[in-house]
From Swiss-Prot:
Documented EC number(s): 1.1.1.27
Reaction(s) the record says it catalyses: (S)-lactate + NAD(+) = pyruvate + NADH + H(+)
Keywords: Allosteric enzyme, Cytoplasm, NAD, Oxidoreductase, Phosphoprotein
Domain of life from the UniProt record: Bacteria
Residues reported to bind substrate: Q86, R92, N124, P125, V126, D127, D152, T153, A154, R155, T233
Residues with Phosphotyrosine modification: Y224
Location in the cell: Cytoplasm
UniProt-recorded name of the protein: L-lactate dehydrogenase
Gene Ontology process terms (BP): glycolytic process; lactate metabolic process
General function of this protein: Catalyzes the conversion of lactate to pyruvate.
Natural source organism: Geobacillus sp. (strain WCH70)
The protein's annotated pathway: Fermentation; pyruvate fermentation to lactate; (S)-lactate from pyruvate: step 1/1
Regulation: Allosterically activated by fructose 1,6-bisphosphate (FBP).
Residues the record lists as binding beta-D-fructose 1,6-bisphosphate: R157, H172
Amino acid sequence: MKRQCMNRVALIGTGFVGASYAFALMNQGIADELVLIDVNKEKAEGDVMDLNHGKVFAPKPMNIWHGDYQDCQDADLVVICAGANQKPGETRLDLVDKNMNIFKTIVDSVMRSGFDGIFLVATNPVDILTYATWKFSGLPKERVIGSGTILDTARFRFLLSEYFQVAPTNVHAYIIGEHGDTELPVWSHAEIGSVPIEQILSQNDRYRKEDLENIFVNVRDAAYQVIEKKGATYYGIAMGLVRITRAILHNENAILTVSAYLDGQYNEQNVYIGVPAIINRNGIREVMELKLNETEQQQFHHSATVLKDILSRYFDDVK
């Protein structure tokens, strides 16, 4: 009966990102139950106490407790934020060796509980580890989702909104590809309202292509800048994870840029990578295939190739 009327989220990893996600989830009143699981039990217990002390101010009551992997059995969604953090000077791909073994242990432990829900992966390198989660879990590909380029897309829309002086909600633009150094902007589908940005540039001398190129560079390198200043990024990605959570638990059929499995879309195979996808209670309903121009298609293929080159070191069927 609980599975029919209650939404349970199991959060694995209560570091900066995990704790921020738990806080944002409680504040938005999306889930009914939240169980925190961490190798550092004292930290998880402290977070539970802290969150529960603020529950009276939340929009709706949420049952929050510290648990273990067996609590994943009745979870609708398992969110993985555990793993080694990116340090100054490191790329996200530098974290692969550190986190692959951690993920094997985590996913095996979750599946032993009898879990039959959806995985949402946030740990970097997210595209690689989402693929690993799919392989380790044996779940259908649509029920394993990575945060992908949801934060990059949000950063992109924010900076474009600042440049064009419009609300971010009126900016429609995507960052796709690896959540990392090979990601790319889809300028051919970027719009302010319903007006293509390329059209705005051609009609108004106030806006310059060079400025837009700098905006993308700032999007791509934003994590490095934040890490250099404060040691880690966590608020933005936590909000993105909650947005994906809402789309899943509320069956929204929302289009979000997540790390999704490609099986021929964008002319790519056997890779998880950031693309727009329709998200609902069943996970990824379908991948939205944008018609890329030739340059974008080449950049996207390069991004997928970089990811597959790394995956091939760990999985024999990736070529």
